[in-house]
Design a protein with these regions (language model features):
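A conserved pocket-lining segment of Rossmann-fold NAD(P)-dependent short-chain dehydrogenase/reductase
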Residues: 138-140, 190-208, 212
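NAD(P)H-binding glycine-rich loop region in Rossmannoid oxidoreductase-like domains
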Residues: 38-45, 49-95, 103
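Substrate-positioning beta->alpha
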Residues: 183-184, 201-222, 228
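Active-site Tyr-X1-5-Lys
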Residues: 140-168
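Glycine/proline-rich active-site loop of Rossmann-fold NAD(P)-dependent oxidoreductases
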Residues: 163-165, 177-187, 220-230
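N-terminal Rossmann NAD(P)H-binding glycine-rich loop of SDR-like oxidoreductase domains
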Residues: 5-27
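Conserved Rossmann-fold NAD(P)-dependent oxidoreductase catalytic core, especially the SDR/UDP-sugar
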Residues: 98-144
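Mid/C-terminal beta-alpha module of Rossmann-like enzyme folds, strongest
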Residues: 216-279, 297, 302, 309-328
Length: 328
């Protein structure tokens, strides 16, 4: 075990964080995983590391969690997509980040790695994919989740400039792979894999193997420029192309949803939200589904040595894990 380094991973039982913990342990790095009391630990079964039960919005818990750690990987977040405003997510995604940054400075940690989202960076086309220099797109300005993460990014960058916080920001795109116990992004397999007929939108997005993202994040302990953002991006695929990979060997029939149908459903969803009724779909995320949400991961490949993504391998490994865990 690397006795010179202990890494705190917040939200350690989450999809990305669980893969990060595995990558750290494979490098013989000591890990402290911060999770809520009574958290579901299925994604971390069989791993030997220190578990710290606490609340990331509690200053005392945060201070105790950070104490003795030389690196912080802050992956805990409220990823709910049902809010159009950042305020309901502010306490977890912004205030908790502030508490961790303050604790990092008090305890003189060597590096702070903040896990944000690719959605804080404007997307592009296949020919001209989104990169770290792009401001957030207009569609994601109506996503409470994206805006709360963008606010947290700004707080970190201010601390870098004013108080020399040694921090880097990771912006992963849509991640796929094993150990998605919740599931989060893995819900897409539940929608696509078992069904003979699958309704898909016209658009597409960037798909990243969660293990490639985890490698880049762990490399960021010693690589990457302070204050910089890094898109952890893999392959740009339309939803139809992605379905072709997911349905490999199965007679699944793809049915394209007309744009106007999705937009209409999005309008209905936004109306329900105004009435206080939960709806996963809104006008803004309906428009995102019919857009080409594409990015490049060139910067992370060059500066963080992020390995390339094979979506086919990531999909197969994810499906194998879900089936072994009887989730598919």
């Amino acid at each position: 075990m690397n006795s010179e380094m202990k890494v705190l991973v917040t939200g350690a039982n989450g999809f990305l964080a669980a893969n990060v913990v595995r990558e750290l342990l494979s490098r013989d790095i000591e890990v402290r995983g911060m999770v809520r009391q009574h958290a579901d630990m299925k994604s971390l079964e069989g791993l030997d590391f220190e578990i710290f039960h606490g609340n990331i919005t509690n200053a005392s818990d945060v201070d105790k969690a950070v104490s003795g750690c030389s690196v912080i990987i802050h992956a805990a977040a409220d990823t709910s997509q049902r809010y159009s405003q950042a305020s309901p997510l502010y306490r977890v995604n912004v205030e908790a980040t502030r508490l961790l940054v303050e604790a990092a400075q008090r305890h003189k940690t060597d590096r702070f790695i903040f896990i944000s989202t690719g959605n804080t960076i404007g997307f592009g086309s296949r020919e001209n994919p989104g990169h770290e220099g792009n401001p957030i797109g207009s569609l994601f300005q109506k996503s409470g989740y994206a805006m709360s993460k963008l606010e947290a990014e700004k707080r970190i960058q201010e601390e870098v400039k004013k108080n020399n916080l040694n921090a880097v920001i990771m912006n992963p795109t849509f991640m796929i792979g094993p150990f998605d116990a919740k599931p989060g992004s893995g819900r897409i397999f539940k929608m696509m894999y078992p069904n003979k007929m699958v309704f898909i939108p016209r658009g597409g997005k960037n798909f990243t193997d969660v293990r490639a993202a985890s490698t880049a994040i762990c490399n960021a302990i010693t690589m990457g420029k302070t204050g910089e953002r890094y898109l952890l991006a893999g392959e740009n695929l339309s939803y139809h192309e992605f379905l072709e990979i997911v349905r490999f060997g199965k007679k699944t029939i793809p049915v394209l949803i007309p744009d106007w149908v999705l937009i209409f459903l999005g309008v209905c969803g936004s109306f329900l939200r105004r009435l206080g009724i939960h709806s996963e779909l809104s006008i803004s995320n309906a428009k995102i589904l019919v857009s080409d949400d594409y990015y490049t991961g060139r910067k992370a490949a060059e500066e963080l040595k992020m390995p390339p993504t094979s979506v086919r391998v990531a999909v197969n490994d994810a499906i194998d894990w879900f089936q072994k865990d009887k989730m598919l």
